[in-house]
Amino acid sequence: MATMKIKKGDLVKVIAGKDINNEGKVIAVNAKNNTLLVEGINMVTKHTKPSMSNQQGGIVHQEAPIDASNVMLIHDGKPTRVGFKMDGDKKVRFAKSTGKVID
């Protein structure tokens, strides 16, 4: 399994799919499936039954996972590809467009 280039809290732009050109913040990362949950992106309608914990039930709108290959990290206001390099003895992410270290 490869290292995820996108982390929780990153600002990303969707480059493929129904929400193309939209931007959002990463809520969750699933490295096993290579998917992300992005705030306000890939919204689905879920119908829930009333239960003990959810007395009301009804229709809920929530984010569905989107593949990590369909988003690009936004760095300095522009989408960029992400690479890894060694900074001393630490492995850090860097923006391939500018060469600057991201974190």
From Swiss-Prot:
Record bears the keyword Flavoprotein: no
Pfam families referenced in this protein's UniProt entry, alphabetically: KOW, ribosomal_L24
InterPro entries listed in its UniProt record: KOW (IPR005824), Rib_uL2_dom2 (IPR014722), Ribosomal_uL24 (IPR003256), Ribosomal_uL24_KOW (IPR041988), Translation_prot_SH3-like_sf (IPR008991)
SUPFAM superfamilies with a match to the protein in the record: Translation proteins SH3-like domain
GO function term, MF aspect, one: rRNA binding
Gene Ontology BP terms: translation
HAMAP family: Ribosomal_uL24_B
Subunit note: Part of the 50S ribosomal subunit.
Function noted in UniProt: One of two assembly initiator proteins, it binds directly to the 5'-end of the 23S rRNA, where it nucleates assembly of the 50S subunit. One of the proteins that surrounds the polypeptide exit tunnel on the outside of the subunit.
Protein name: Large ribosomal subunit protein uL24
Highest classification ranks of the organism: Bacteria, Bacillati, Bacillota, Clostridia, Lachnospirales
